[in-house]
Amino acid sequence: MKHITFSETEKFKYALLIKESALSYKEIKTHYIDHINKDILAVSLKYNSENKAPAILMKEYSEELLKGVDSLGVELLIVADSNYFKFLTKAKKADSFGYIKDCAIKGFNHIKVTLSVNYQALFHNPTLKDKLILSNNLIKNYINNTYVPLGINIIHSSKYPNTIKEIKQELSNLHKYPMISCDVETYGLNLENNDIGTIAFAWDKHNGIAFKVKMHQLSNLVKKELKEFFLKYTGTIIYHNATFDIKMLIYVLFMDNPLDYKGTITGLNLFYKRMHDTKIIIYLCTNNAAGNKLGLKHNSYEFAGDYSLKEIKDITKVNQDTLLEYNLIDCLSTWYVFDKFYPKLIKENQLNIYENLMLNSLKIITNMELVGLPINPDKLKKTSEELHTFLNSLIRRLEAFNIIKDYEEVLVQKACEEANMKLKRKKKTIDDFNIKFNPNSGKQLQGLLYEFMGLPILEYTDKGQPATGANTLKNLLNHTNNKNYQEIINTLIEITKVSKIVSTFIPAFNNGYLKQDNRIYLHGSFNLGGTVSGRLSSNSP
């Protein structure tokens, strides 16, 4: 165990734990000590020769480490290592920057633990600098007895109107603010059978309102008041991920039915008249080669802390009072993010791109999401049947190759041997097994290509397994002159392509939104700022 000291004291209340490769006097002083306190002991963390820290290694090393720092009077461990932080606190994730936790190791629960950043990571991901600054400030406040957990007291005033009269009054009060933020909590992410459970508004990062919509026993009256408010409000509304909130507001408040295109256009023209989207602002301000995170909670973390709810994917499982406060904090955080990044947007001369390209594109995207892609169910069924027939013919073609038949015998022999190794008395024979080659089995495909056929391994998966994807199969064609091998590989490529359509696209099409015109509609969720390159992406589907 190696260590570095920065003062002449013999007792230390605070210890920085960091990988031995990062245990540098100059770097630790520059990135931590100069910003916090010189009376900090820096201690190395052990990793094996493969630069990994398995649980058994951390367990053995932590016992020695904790005894050592405890004998020196250490009260707080500053852990600049995600693996050791999770081990010491039993946390599932290492993302709780800005919080003080108890050490979970028996006998050392009196020691506090906080997460920091290894300065070496800044070279690959400069955006981690904000986390390091946040961590340093937290520790400094803790030492000075001024530590306050993130997110505490960010709500200065809040109202949760419940009666129609109260809701109407609070909505009326919003008209005096030239700019407000808005956020909705819904029953799901798709349009079908969805609705707005609650809605919140805020006029700055500390004050706002939230109330029930569909969850209200008089939901139709609440929706009527909401629609009237949006029609009359002349200010600017800030959203985070505006396409979702606006899409749901139009769908719930302005469309009489899922095919009401007139209501769609009315809503689009209304909501996109004066608005901001902090997700797009963040994208323009932070886009870089290392990648960026556009989520509201990530970008407001130093303000609101970790206020996420595990049950938020199903709002019916969340206490309604808790949900309303959560909804409001989303609005407050939206304001915080706007105040944080909008000045930077202007300073970087990106206002023209933001207003004339990005925001205009959001209106088009929301229209696309609401209208959807129509599919003829009869033609979908026919296409599905044809694809399944074609896939079966490809599999029969593959099974007809003698090489595949020989490989199936190998699979049977192997299965028989493995079964008999587990049996003590009664033994099995190859006649007890009927194994067909499964081209969708990565393990079997690896065995066929690289062991039985002896083809070279060209690339590996992220998990270190020999790759067998369509692109790899295409490349393998250039590494054999055997005509049978080439025919088998070409057949496997076709099977891979058709299988993907049959197993991925067809089910998604069948699960689309069946509307009154007897057509199935696909409603995507498009991400304008979801990629480094700026291309449009989609999810669900």
Regions found by a protein language model. Give the residues of each.
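Alpha-helix capping/helix-boundary segments
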Residues: 83-85, 244, 444
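Conserved RNase H-like, two-metal-ion catalytic cores of nucleic-acid enzymes
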Residues: 9, 13-16, 21-41, 149-298, ...
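Phosphate- and divalent-cation-binding pockets in alpha/beta enzyme and binding domains
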Residues: 86-87, 247-251, 448
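Conserved "right-hand" nucleotidyltransferase catalytic core of DNA-directed polymerases
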Residues: 141-213, 266, 271, 291, ...
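Active-site catalytic pocket residues across diverse enzymes, especially alpha/beta-hydrolases
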Residues: 91-92, 253-257, 341
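Residue-level signal for well-ordered alpha-helical positions
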Residues: 90-91, 126-128, 252, 287, ...
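A polyanion-binding, active-site-adjacent surface
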Residues: 1-148
